[in-house]
C-alpha cells in the first residue's frame, strides 16, 4: 500500500522535508535489522511502500522447525508422499512460509504470483500478501465464471505419460508481467512447466519458481 508523504506530514504535523529525512533513517534501520523494506516513490502522487520481511536468523529457526515437523515418521504416506495439509492450513505457519519465500524475491520486482488450483492457493496467497501483489489461479478444468480463457496442453506425471490441459482467465494477467510461480508440491515438474507455457501465451516473464 502506497502511503503519501502528506499523510505523515498531517498526522505528525511536520514538514515533508523532515518526514523524508526520517524515512531515510527508518529505511536504513529496517534493512539493518531485516524486518522489512521501505520503497520510496517519487512524484506528485508519490510516497512510501513498506514490505515486511523476516530476519535471516528467524527464517533459519522457522525452516528448522518445519524440517523437524516434516521429518515425523507418521507423515509418510503410501507412495512416498508427505502429509502437508495440517501445516498448510495453520495460519501462523502459512504466514511464516509466505514471509520466508517472499524474502528471496523481495528485490525481483514481482508483478503477480501464480499457482494452480487448489492446494497451492493458500501458499500463493501468503506469498502474494507479503509482496503486496495479486495472485492468479490456474485451473485444470474450465469454469464458466472465469470468462474467456487461454489454455495450454502440458505433460503430466513423473513418467510423462499423460497429456492434460490447464486454463487461465484472460483477465487474470497483464502482458509484460513478471510472475513468481508458487506451488505446494513438485513431482515431475509437468505442472510448473505448464504454467511457464501459459506465461508465454500472456507475453509475461518468469521471475522465479518456489515449491
Model-derived segments and their meaning:
Residues 4, 8-12:
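Short alpha-helical "recognition helix" segments of helix-turn-helix
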Residues 133-179:
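Short, glycine/charge-rich flexible loops or terminal/linker lids adjacent to PRPP-binding catalytic cores
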Amino acid at each position: 500500500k502506497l502511503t503519501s508523504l502528506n499523510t505523515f506530514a498531517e498526522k505528525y504535523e511536520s514538514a515533508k522535508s523532515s518526514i523524508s529525512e526520517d524515512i531515510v533513517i527508518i529505511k536504513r534501520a529496517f534493512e539493518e535489522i531485516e524486518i522489512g523494506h521501505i520503497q520510496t516513490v517519487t512524484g506528485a502522487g508519490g510516497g512510501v511502500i513498506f514490505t515486511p520481511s523476516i530476519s535471516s536468523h528467524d527464517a533459519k529457526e522457522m525452516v528448522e522447525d518445519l524440517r523437524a515437523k516434516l521429518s515425523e515418521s507418521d507423515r509418510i504416506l503410501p507412495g512416498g508422499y508427505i502429509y502437508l495439509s495440517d501445516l498448510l492450513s495453520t495460519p501462523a505457519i502459512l504466514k511464516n512460509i509466505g514471509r520466508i519465500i517472499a524474502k528471496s524475491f523481495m528485490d525481483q520486482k514481482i508483478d503477480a504470483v501464480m499457482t494452480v488450483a487448489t492446494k497451492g492457493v493458500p501458499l500463493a496467497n501468503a506469498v502474494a500478501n507479503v509482496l503486496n501483489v495479486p495472485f492468479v489461479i490456474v485451473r485444470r478444468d474450465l469454469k464458466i465464471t472465469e470468462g474467456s480463457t487461454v489454455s495450454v496442453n502440458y505433460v503430466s506425471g513423473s513418467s510423462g505419460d499423460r497429456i492434460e490441459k490447464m486454463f487461465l482467465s484472460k483477465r487474470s494477467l497483464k502482458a509484460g508481467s513478471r510472475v513468481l510461480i508458487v506451488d505446494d508440491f513438485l513431482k515431475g515438474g509437468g505442472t510448473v512447466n505448464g504454467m511457464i507455457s501459459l506465461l508465454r501465451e500472456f507475453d509475461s516473464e518468469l521471475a522465479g519458481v518456489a515449491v
